[in-house]
Curated annotation (Swiss-Prot):
Protein name: F-BAR and double SH3 domains protein 2
Coiled-coil blocks: 356-397
Result after altering P521A: Loss of ability to promote actin polymerization
UniProt-listed GO biological process terms: clathrin-dependent endocytosis; membrane organization; neuromuscular synaptic transmission; positive regulation of actin filament polymerization; positive regulation of Arp2/3 complex-mediated actin nucleation; protein transport; regulation of actin filament polymerization
Function per UniProt: Adapter protein that plays a role in endocytosis via clathrin-coated pits. Contributes to the internalization of cell surface receptors, such as integrin ITGB1 and transferrin receptor. Promotes endocytosis of EGFR in cancer cells, and thereby contributes to the down-regulation of EGFR signaling. Recruited to clathrin-coated pits during a mid-to-late stage of assembly, where it is required for normal progress from U-shaped intermediate stage pits to terminal, omega-shaped pits. Binds to membranes enriched in phosphatidylinositol 3,4-bisphosphate or phosphatidylinositol 3,4,5-trisphosphate.
Keyword Cell membrane: yes
Basic and acidic residues bias spans: 307-323
Residue positions where Phosphoserine is found in the record: S675, S681
Topology of the protein relative to the lipid bilayer: Peripheral membrane protein
Amino acid sequence: MQPPPRKVKVTQELKNIQVEQMTKLQAKHQAECDLLEDMRTFSQKKAAIEREYAQGMQKLASQYLKRDWPGVKADDRNDYRSMYPVWKSFLEGTMQVAQSRMNICENYKNFISEPARTVRSLKEQQLKRCVDQLTKIQTELQETVKDLAKGKKKYFETEQMAHAVREKADIEAKSKLSLFQSRISLQKASVKLKARRSECNSKATHARNDYLLTLAAANAHQDRYYQTDLVNIMKALDGNVYDHLKDYLIAFSRTELETCQAVQNTFQFLLENSSKVVRDYNLQLFLQENAVFHKPQPFQFQPCDSDTSRQLESETGTTEEHSLNKEARKWATRVAREHKNIVHQQRVLNDLECHGAAVSEQSRAELEQKIDEARENIRKAEIIKLKAEARLDLLKQIGVSVDTWLKSAMNQVMEELENERWARPPAVTSNGTLHSLNADTEREEGEEFEDNMDVFDDSSSSPSGTLRNYPLTCKVVYSYKASQPDELTIEEHEVLEVIEDGDMEDWVKARNKVGQVGYVPEKYLQFPTSNSLLSMLQSLAALDSRSHTSSNSTEAELVSGSLNGDASVCFVKALYDYEGQTDDELSFPEGAIIRILNKENQDDDGFWEGEFNGRIGVFPSVLVEELSASENGDTPWMREIQISPSPKPHASLPPLPLYDQPPSSPYPSPDKRSSLYFPRSPSANEKSLHAESPGFSQASRHTPETSYGKLRPVRAAPPPPTQNHRRPAEKIEDVEITLV
């Protein structure tokens, strides 16, 4: 740990600043004098050479032409967008009109050489006067700052003394009367102490007032120094040197133009084309001459001598196929994650740039550092995303279903970003500090899923055109055999629980009595009407009469592990069903509680390692959400679950076998608005933990084909069979039941 920086006195800091100001002004003055001297000597030499007629002029120009300038070639000598050809053409034109310079030697002496010497002499004198005046002004400011330091010191001493007297008086007032002390003596001491405290308070107040007045005067003096005195000194030091320099530069070209028509044509052409010098063209020439900056050839695949393949290969039904699918899923997840990182960092960058003016001077450097870090993070995320997209393009070329994984991952990320946008509080500026700038930065370090609990609720939009409140119970009218992995086989007269709509019309997602979930044709089902509630309750009562007689051992282990295990154990909840594509991947249903073993790996592919039902494996992190500290078993209701007896079902009206979450987990699913987090009361937990009836067995935990995480069907639903296939005698009326 480094020691804290040493505090520098205000007076010493002011002296250092003033010394640096003086040094910079002298350096600026010296540079201007050097430029005047260069112009003066150049005019003298040129006039002397003109006296010697053409020989002397050619000698002068040849001295400058001998220098090798980069970017000057024979084929681009007439391209005046480059600065070096312009300067070279100027020297060549000088040599061409050498004989005409004899008549203008006096003009150089009268208009440039002598005035430049006079201007430089005056500038040296002005520098001496300005330095003396600036030194005097700086000394006055130093004296003001010294008075401020004295007033501050006196204020601190008197205030500390007054504080000590006040503390002593408070202690004496709270002390009890001793056996050997009389009340009169205590009163005298109290009066004396109060007088002392009043005197110290008066001195402290006087010192504070003097300090504040001195502070105001010092600030005013400092403002005067920077806004008036320093500006006037710099203006006096510059004088009219820039006007003289401008006149000298004009005199060089004007004198040459007035010599003769040939000279006029030459320098008029140079004058017009000198303004065409641009940085982009000079940079282009530089890149053309230096091949080291050119883009090299793409890297080529170098096969082994015995290998004849030159591209990715996929064999159906082999491990390679699963490996390529895993790579597609891995890099699609990475693309989505980096897209989210770019959006977050761009949001941080916009906040920093928009609120930069409100930041105080002390934190300006920190603000610039944060802006640079945000831009660097965006650049890195764009590179990672570009590399991942290149991998996906190559996988797509050989037929891997890249679009499926990419669409699924991007939909998830876009829903999270939309939810974050609505849940994101506005930026608040207070005391020059932006309190909302760190929120988006911290979000990149740990993805926040707490605001995304309502993202997956699709019940508000029904593709079929009918608004329904899911889940609801319906009856199968026609039998249907699943033809796709994400579909569900149903039998006639079977009772299903419809949980949500599909993306395409005439498809809905349903769960059967054994807990299997999949898509079924909507027209194959009979949805409940507004009557026959009693018959529906009677037909469904038997399915749930035994739901409160058994408990789940996995739930008991989870609660016990949360209470008795390590406090650092982290749990996550599955947002979708997932089936592992390889042996080392973990399979789990929606709502499952998974214990996290490791969040970091060497590939950084978005996969975490966890344990579920005694099995250890890896799984995509975008399919789960982290549970908060209260949900990991640190709240009292988790302890009450173990000791509270299960309530017996009411004899008159048994509960309906409708579930707000998959039977594989005792906790509510995040895509149901009726429950966001774990239950908050013991009674609510008991109902949730014992809501699983024997009719909905645990055998459906590993049914990945019907997972929520896969894409919804985009195929057309099959038409229902003819009406003769249905037996009208067995028509059953259903009723829509919404759980609260």
